[in-house]
Amino acid sequence: MKQVNMNRNERRQMRHKRVIKKIRRIDNDRPVMIVVKSNSHISAQVWDFNQNKIIASSSSVSLDLVNGNKENAAVVGTDIANKLLKMKIDEITFDHGGSKYHGRIAALADAARKAGLKF
């Protein structure tokens, strides 16, 4: 049910709960790529729940990119995909948190798919 009187933060939290519920229900054995965006940067890290550690990460800050726009999000996506493919990991689960799958998040995901990841 859509609630009209919710502010932006409450809607983001509801989206995040939905995404987490789907991840836990469907893909328990795959590593999870968690994407976080701020106003000026974007970052992605891959978490392996079986080993309980982060196995790869990439961000617009670590790559010395000026901002986190769509083009730079695509660069981050290809970078983390190449790191995972070197570790022979090609299937992951994508967690976009409470952010909409749109814009920078979608650009990062599409670039990771083009580089060879499956999710």
Swiss-Prot record:
Alphabetic keyword roster: Ribonucleoprotein, Ribosomal protein, RNA-binding, rRNA-binding
Molecular function GO labels: 5S rRNA binding; structural constituent of ribosome
CDD domains: Ribosomal_L18_L5e
GO biological process: translation
SUPFAM superfamilies registered for this protein in UniProt: Translational machinery components
Entry coiled-coil feature ranges: none
One cellular component term from this protein's GO annotations in UniProt: cytosolic large ribosomal subunit
InterPro entries per record: Ribosomal_uL18_bac-type, Ribosomal_uL18_bac/euk
Pfam families tied to this protein: Ribosomal_L18p (PF00861)
Function of the protein: This is one of the proteins that bind and probably mediate the attachment of the 5S RNA into the large ribosomal subunit, where it forms part of the central protuberance.
UniProt xrefs under HAMAP family: Ribosomal_uL18_B (MF_01337_B)
Family listed: Belongs to the universal ribosomal protein uL18 family.
Complex formation: Part of the 50S ribosomal subunit; part of the 5S rRNA/L5/L18/L25 subcomplex. Contacts the 5S and 23S rRNAs.
Protein name: Large ribosomal subunit protein uL18
Source organism (scientific name): Mycoplasmoides gallisepticum (strain R(low / passage 15 / clone 2)) (Mycoplasma gallisepticum)
